[in-house]
Amino acid sequence: MSESGTLTNKESDTKILSVLVSDPQKQKTHSQTYITYQVSTKIDGKDEPNCVVRRYNDFVLLHQILINDHPALLVPPLPDKKVLNYLSGDRFSHSFTQKRCRSLQTFMRRLLSHSELSKSRILETFLTSTDWDVYRRSLTGQISTSEVSDVLINAFKHVNRQRDEFVEIKEKSEKLDHNLSHLDKLFHKSVKRVDLIGQNLKKLQSSLSGLQELCCDEKELSNSIKAFNDGTMQLIDSLNDLNKYVDYEYNVDIKDMINYIEALKQLIRLKDQKQIDYEELSEYLTRSINEKNNLLSGYGSGNYFKSKLEELAGINQEMARRDKIAKLETRVQSLTDEVEKSKQVADEFEKEVLKEVEQFEQIKTLELKDSLAALAQKHIDFYDDMVEKWSKIEERLESA
């Protein structure tokens, strides 16, 4: 990697306290339209936050560099690129940009929660540098994806000897993924139903307004209808606010957690690939040793007809046998070294993954707890507000 690339492997001395991703803005140039986000970083020892503007593609580059430089670490995932939104033009809609902003905020929070990734120099550069565009151009073509390719190629191979810890981790991940996916579907249906209820309430409110006009001569009845209609309008506004929170924040949090679990699965698959490499090398070494031992015992790996053909061709079988043995000894020695290296790599990678799983569990538990607590508080606030407002409506109805 070039000098600009070596920067990514260094640790930062800057202590980052918090990061806020906000203010998505639509930008236009002569050739393209895109969304930018303001990234505000609070740094220890500085009174004012450092603010920079980044595009989604800048986050993508940061993500790729972190994966490239830390293959054994669980780098949080970015929000998916919604292909349908891009085709329909909805990627510039308020809903799309706000949801993506929420996901990018989650991405940054997870990076800061990670014991090693939070110290990455590239993260500091991303958050504070005014020359990010120059740095980005200097890295063009240097990001490797070979590890991911290896995992895809060996997607149908399985580890022969899987540790019980990883069997349990996989089972727990699958179960959590299944439950969250079910929740995701339920809350998406809930958002649509509440939206439909809101539309029906608007129709009711419109009808009540018409009825109020018809009863203008009957002051008492007109006041009662107006009081009830005011309550209906307040209910519509509060219900829309609650539904927007569920749609823009809670549902996004669930989806981000599902993606986080998938990133963990991908890391475990990469760990499995290291184990598969070791197992395949070990099997190849065993076959080579057996073949050499057979030749030393005089049996050889060839059949009777092959021996006769070699004899008719004037090949000295004893010399050929010694030749094969020498080649096999060289191969066995080389494979023995490779197996030892592969075993060391697999074991070290496994240890790192176990550490990552532990950090994932901590971050996951905190996020789910905070997300559910915020959802519960939003509902509590909604019902408290409705009790207060409708109590006042009731007083108006009684005094009408």
Curated annotation (Swiss-Prot):
A 1,2-diacyl-sn-glycero-3-phospho-(1D-myo-inositol-3-phosphate) binds at R55, K81, R100. Keywords: Autophagy, Coiled coil, Cytoplasm, Endosome, Lipid-binding, Membrane, Protein transport, Transport. This is Sorting nexin-4. It comes from Kluyveromyces lactis (strain ATCC 8585 / CBS 2359 / DSM 70799 / NBRC 1267 / NRRL Y-1140 / WM37). It is found in: Cytoplasm, Cytosol; Preautophagosomal structure membrane; Endosome membrane. PROSITE patterns: PX. Residues 15-134 form the PX domain. The keyword Cytoplasm applies.
